[in-house]
Amino acid sequence: MKKTVKILLILITVFLKVHCNGGHDDEAADFLSHTNIDDPNNSSDPNKNSDQGDTMGEDEDRLVIDLFREYNFLIRPVKNVSSPPVVVDFGVAMILLINVDEKNQILQTNVWLTMKWNDFQLAWNPAEYGNISNLHVPSDRVWLPDIVLFNNADGNYEVSFKSNVFVDHHGDVTWVPPAMFKSSCRIDVEWFPFDEQCCTLVFGSWTYNSEEVRLHWYNNIQAVQLHDYSYSGIWDVIDVPGQLVHKPDLKENKMVFNVVIRRKTLFYTVILIIPTVLMAFLSVMAFYLPVDSGEKVSLTISLLLALVVFLLLVSKILPPTSNIPLMGKYLLLAFVLNITAVVGTVVIVNIYFRSALSHKMPTWVRKVFLEFLPHLLVMKRPERIPIFNGYFVEEYCASEIFDASLVMPSMTATMLPFLQVTTNLKAASSTSSGQSSEHHENCSKWKKRLSIRMSKRRAPRARLDDDSEDIIDDTNGNHVDSLQEKISKEMKTTVEAIAYIAEHMKREMSLKKMRDDWKYVAMVLDRLILLIFFGVTLGGTLGIICSAPHVFDFVDQEAIISKLNAKYLPSDMYS
C-alpha cells in the first residue's frame, strides 16, 4: 500500500513539472520548427557536438526564444498610441515586363517589392548572443505592413510568395518578396502601332492611414529600379518615374510609379502596315487595267474584301475606345478610296461601251475629254485613219465613194465606164439642182495618191471600146437621157448594190468613229482618276503614318536603361 502511494506521488510530481515547463517553451519550440533551427537538446547531427557548433546553436536558439517570447505579430510595432507612425521605406524593382493586353487594358509585370521598417521589439545586443547581428525568420512570424497594389486587375492584391524577412540587431526589418502583378492600364490607341503607353502601379497600405503607417522612398530611389530588368521583345521601357502622394486632410499616403513604354513597330510594320499600303496602291492600278480585260471591277472588289479583313483584325487587337487608332484611320482612308474606285470603275465601263445608237456625245464632253484633258494629261491620240478595202483613206467624199478605183480595184474594165457614168451623173445632178459639189479639201490629194497606188498594183487596162468612149463623151450636155437608156438593167443593179455597200460601210465607219470617241473618253477618265487616286493615296499615306510622334525614332534599350539607372539610382549603387 505504501509503495503504491509513493508511485502515485512520483507520477503526480513528474506530471506537474512537465506541464509547467512545456507551456513556457511552446512558442519558442514552434518557432524553431519553422526556422529550421535545431534544438540542441534533441540534435542528432554529430557535427553539432563541437564546441563552436554548440555555442552558435545555443546562442541563436536563446536569441530566438528571447525575441519571440512575448512578441505579438498582430500588433503594430509602436510603444504607445501617441507614438509616431511606422515609417516604411518602399521600393519597386521591375524584373520583367511580361505582357500588355491591349484588348483588356491590363499590364502584367514581374517585380520585386522592397519594404524596410523598424520593429523595436526585435532589437538585441549582439554581445549577449555570441555576436549574432542578424536573423532570417519566416515572414508570418513578424508584423508586416499590409501594402498592396491598388489598381490590381485580377483580384490578387497580395504577393503570392511570402519570403523570409531579414532582421538586424537594431530592429530593422527588411522584406523583399517577389510578385507577379496584373495591373489596370489605360491604353491610348491613337497612334497604334507607333504608340507609347504610360501604365501606373499604385501602392499603399490597405488598412492603415498615414498617421499609422507612412511610406518613404527606399534608399531615396524615386523610380522603379531597373538594374535587374530583362529586356522585352515587344516593348521598350522609356521612363519609370515615381511619385509619393501624401494627403494630410484625407490621411492618405501612397506611391505611384509610372511605367512609360513604347511599342516595337517592326512586327506590325511587316504584318499590317506594308500589306495595307500595297493594297491601297494596288487599288490605284485598277485604273491602269484595260476595260476590255473585264477584271477592273473584280480587282477593286477583291481589294475591298481584303481591307475589310484587315479592319476586323485591328478591331480584335485594340479595345473599343473613343479614339480612332492611326492604323484604323489609314484603313478607313483606303476603304473609302477603294469604294470610290469601284464606283469610278463602273462609270468608266459604262462610258467605254457606249455607242452612237444609244448615247449622243454632248459638245462639252467632246471639248473637255477629247481636246482639253488629253493635252493636260499628255495623252496623244492616234490619227483616225479608217481602213477601206485595204487602202488608207482619211475621210470619204460623197463623189469619190462610188469611184470604182476606191471600191473594187479588181473590177474589170467593162464595168468601170458605168460606175464613172453614175458618179458623173450624181455630180451633174447636184450641180443642176444648185447644191454644193465641192469636195473635202483632202479629197483631190487622196484621190491622186490612190490613183498612183492603184496604177502600181494593177495591170494596164484594156482600151475602152468605141461604144464606151461614146457613152463617156456623151454624158455631158443634152445626151444624159439617151446615155442612161443604153445602160443595161444588170449594170444598174450592180451599181446600186455597190453604192449600197459603200454607203453601208461609210455608215459603219461613222458609227465606229463615234464608238471610238466614247472609248477614248473612258481612257481619258481612267487616266485622270488614276492620277488623282495616286496623289490622294500617296498624300494620305505620308500624312497619316508620318503624323505619329515616334515613327522615325530609334530606341536603344540598353542605353536607355543605363541612362535611367544613372538618373535615379544613388551613385554607390549605380557604380
UniProtKB/Swiss-Prot annotation:
<dbReference type="GO" id="GO:1904315">
    <property type="term" value="F:transmitter-gated monoatomic ion channel activity involved in regulation of postsynaptic membrane potential"/>
</dbReference>
<feature type="transmembrane region" description="Helical">
    <location>
        <begin position="331"/>
        <end position="351"/>
    </location>
</feature>
<dbReference type="Pfam" id="PF02931">
    <property type="entry name" value="Neur_chan_LBD"/>
</dbReference>
<dbReference type="GO" id="GO:0010468">
    <property type="term" value="P:regulation of gene expression"/>
</dbReference>
<feature type="transmembrane region" description="Helical">
    <location>
        <begin position="528"/>
        <end position="548"/>
    </location>
</feature>
<comment type="subunit">
    <text>Component of nicotinic acetylcholine receptor. In cholinergic motoneurons, composed of 2 non-alpha subunits acr-2 and acr-3, and 3 alpha subunits unc-38, unc-63 and acr-12.</text>
</comment>
<feature type="disulfide bond">
    <location>
        <begin position="185"/>
        <end position="199"/>
    </location>
</feature>
<dbReference type="GO" id="GO:0005886">
    <property type="term" value="C:plasma membrane"/>
</dbReference>
<comment type="similarity">
    <text>Belongs to the ligand-gated ion channel (TC 1.A.9) family. Acetylcholine receptor (TC 1.A.9.1) subfamily.</text>
</comment>
<dbReference type="InterPro" id="IPR006202">
    <property type="entry name" value="Neur_chan_lig-bd"/>
</dbReference>
<dbReference type="GO" id="GO:0007274">
    <property type="term" value="P:neuromuscular synaptic transmission"/>
</dbReference>
<dbReference type="Pfam" id="PF02932">
    <property type="entry name" value="Neur_chan_memb"/>
</dbReference>
<keyword id="KW-0732">Signal</keyword>
<keyword id="KW-0628">Postsynaptic cell membrane</keyword>
<dbReference type="GO" id="GO:0045202">
    <property type="term" value="C:synapse"/>
</dbReference>
<feature type="region of interest" description="Disordered">
    <location>
        <begin position="31"/>
        <end position="57"/>
    </location>
</feature>
<dbReference type="GO" id="GO:0040012">
    <property type="term" value="P:regulation of locomotion"/>
</dbReference>
<keyword id="KW-0812">Transmembrane</keyword>
<keyword id="KW-0325">Glycoprotein</keyword>
<dbReference type="GO" id="GO:0045727">
    <property type="term" value="P:positive regulation of translation"/>
</dbReference>
<dbReference type="GO" id="GO:0098662">
    <property type="term" value="P:inorganic cation transmembrane transport"/>
</dbReference>
<feature type="glycosylation site" description="N-linked (GlcNAc...) asparagine">
    <location>
        <position position="80"/>
    </location>
</feature>
<feature type="glycosylation site" description="N-linked (GlcNAc...) asparagine">
    <location>
        <position position="131"/>
    </location>
</feature>
<keyword id="KW-0406">Ion transport</keyword>
<dbReference type="GO" id="GO:0045211">
    <property type="term" value="C:postsynaptic membrane"/>
</dbReference>
<dbReference type="GO" id="GO:0098703">
    <property type="term" value="P:calcium ion import across plasma membrane"/>
</dbReference>
<dbReference type="InterPro" id="IPR002394">
    <property type="entry name" value="Nicotinic_acetylcholine_rcpt"/>
</dbReference>
<keyword id="KW-0472">Membrane</keyword>
<dbReference type="InterPro" id="IPR006201">
    <property type="entry name" value="Neur_channel"/>
</dbReference>
<keyword id="KW-1133">Transmembrane helix</keyword>
<feature type="compositionally biased region" description="Low complexity">
    <location>
        <begin position="38"/>
        <end position="50"/>
    </location>
</feature>
<dbReference type="InterPro" id="IPR038050">
    <property type="entry name" value="Neuro_actylchol_rec"/>
</dbReference>
<dbReference type="GO" id="GO:0004888">
    <property type="term" value="F:transmembrane signaling receptor activity"/>
</dbReference>
<keyword id="KW-0407">Ion channel</keyword>
<dbReference type="InterPro" id="IPR036734">
    <property type="entry name" value="Neur_chan_lig-bd_sf"/>
</dbReference>
<feature type="signal peptide">
    <location>
        <begin position="1"/>
        <end position="20"/>
    </location>
</feature>
<dbReference type="GO" id="GO:0042391">
    <property type="term" value="P:regulation of membrane potential"/>
</dbReference>
<dbReference type="GO" id="GO:0005231">
    <property type="term" value="F:excitatory extracellular ligand-gated monoatomic ion channel activity"/>
</dbReference>
<feature type="topological domain" description="Extracellular">
    <location>
        <begin position="21"/>
        <end position="270"/>
    </location>
</feature>
<dbReference type="GO" id="GO:0022848">
    <property type="term" value="F:acetylcholine-gated monoatomic cation-selective channel activity"/>
</dbReference>
<keyword id="KW-1003">Cell membrane</keyword>
<dbReference type="GO" id="GO:0034220">
    <property type="term" value="P:monoatomic ion transmembrane transport"/>
</dbReference>
